[in-house]
Every structure is written in structure tokens, then in C-alpha cells.
Amino acid sequence: MQVRQSIHSDHAKQLDTAGLRREFLIEKIFAADDYTMTYSHIDRIIVGGILPVSKAVSIGNEVGKQLGVSYFLERRELGAINIGGPGLIVVDGQTYDIGNEEALYVGKGAKEVKFSSIDRANPAKFYYNSAPAHTTYPNKKITLAEASPQTLGDDATSNRRTINKYIVPDVLPTCQLSMGLTKLAPGSLWNTMPCHTHERRMEVYFYFDMDEETAVFHMMGQPQETRHLLVHNEQAVISPSWSIHSGVGTKRYTFIWGMVGENQVFGDMDHIAVSELR
């Protein structure tokens, strides 16, 4: 398990490229027949991926000592979205079929969570976020059809996109975790522009569905002190509450967003006009 500390905005704006990447970029999300795990001190979110190819992969129980618990989800909830082939998630003996672009919410207290692929030639790829939880809500599978969609932007501004909200209060109850998948319309390259911050929660962007030559210029930093990260396929960016989070790709891409904090109201954000950015 990698650990990322919180960082003050005054410190962040002094970092060079290597420093920004070290603090905010998660370069490797998937490893065959294993899971990855990055623990951020920012709202205590955990981010990672599970790639079961030739065997099932159980997540996280060996990190109990680092988390101060006897098993991974003793005091946490988890959301996973499959971006690969058809897969299975078994939660304490109950099996869920999770296809491409389908999600599973797992409530606090689940003792064993096991991930597997149906076809090793086309393995499932489960991207997950986990957040501290104070109570137990029911496990729930969410399909793309069951997600709450919202289309924003315009072709003229190259930012037309559909925000598919999988794990939000309109779809199911959680303690604090929210997750969704945003698809850009053909020809659109910008996400979340005009941009925003949200003081009451942090966010992680996971970029995928990109070929080897594609990169996303991910904008971050305070609105008057912007910086950027070059992000490639299947990499994630941690965004503190004080930072904008927006990106433009050299070609098409898709991304999953996950938020943790004290407020789950999707529209609770502070919008920033493009003219105000520096």
C-alpha cells in the first residue's frame, strides 16, 4: 500500500514537474493477478485497481494492520467499476456478475471481497475507491442503465459529455462515497471546463480508454496558480479540495471520478470562470 500525505496549496505551487507527479499522480493502477492500493491522507480515500487474469484476487485484508482494523472493510465502504471484460465479485459468499461499465457498491463490514474474470483472454478490470464509513448500507450492483445521466457542455466548445452517476444519493445510499463515469461526445476533448472546486470534498480522476499515443493535460492547482500533469492511459490524479480538476486530451478518452467528503450533493461546487484562471 502506497501512502500519500496531505499537502498545503502554498507548498504545492512551488513544486516542479517531478514533485507534482510524486504528490498527485498515481501512475500504476493495474497489475495482473493482483491489486494496487494508494492511501491518501486527504479525506482518507483509498484508490486502486484489481486485475484478475488467471486467478481470483481478494482485496486488502493483509493491510488491516496498516489501517488499524482486522479486515479491510471493517470501517470502510467500497465502490468498484469494471472497465474490462465480464467479471465476478463475491462478497461474503454472494456473487455479483459485473460486466463492462457496471459497478458494485459494497457496504461497511464485508469481510471477504473476491474479484475474478469470466474469460482470462478478456479479463475484467475493476477500478475502485474506498472511503471511511460510519454505518452499513446494502451492497448494490449498478448498471449503466441504472446510473443517473447528465449531459453537459456543447460541441462548439469541445466539452460535450455525459456524466453517468453510478454511486450517488439518487441511485443508492452511501456514507460519503460518490462515483461515476464520464464519456465525452465524439470530437469533444475537454472535461469539466469551465472548472470548479468543492471545499467540502476531494476528488480523484481516473483516465482510461486511451491508446498509447494519447495523453491528457490535467489542469490542477488553485484557480490563480494553475499547474498541469501529463496523464496517460489508466492513471489517476488526486485532487485536494483547494484544487481545480479539469483536462483536455490529445485524442478521445473516458474517465471515472470519485469523491469523498462531508457533502454528497453533486452540485455543491464553486464555479470558476475561464477568465479568472491564471
Swiss-Prot record:
Instruction: Please list the residues that bind Zn(2+).
Output: 196, 198, 203, 245
Report the superkingdom from the record. Answer: Bacteria
Single Gene Ontology BP annotation: pectin catabolic process
Top-rank EC class of the record's enzyme: isomerase
Taking the record's annotation, the residue ranges forming a coiled coil are none
* Its EC number(s): 5.3.1.17
Q: Name one Pfam family in it.
A: KduI
Q: Which coenzyme or cofactor does it need?
A: Zn(2+)
Return the cofactor note field: Binds 1 zinc ion per subunit.
Copy the pathway line from the protein's UniProt record: Glycan metabolism; pectin degradation; 2-dehydro-3-deoxy-D-gluconate from pectin: step 4/5
Q: Name one GO molecular function term.
A: 4-deoxy-L-threo-5-hexosulose-uronate ketol-isomerase activity
Which of UniProt's keywords are assigned here?
Answer: Isomerase, Metal-binding, Zinc
Catalytic reaction(s) noted: 5-dehydro-4-deoxy-D-glucuronate = 3-deoxy-D-glycero-2,5-hexodiulosonate
What function is annotated for this protein?
Catalyzes the isomerization of 5-dehydro-4-deoxy-D-glucuronate to 3-deoxy-D-glycero-2,5-hexodiulosonate.
Q: What is the recorded name of this protein? A: 4-deoxy-L-threo-5-hexosulose-uronate ketol-isomerase
Source organism: Yersinia pestis
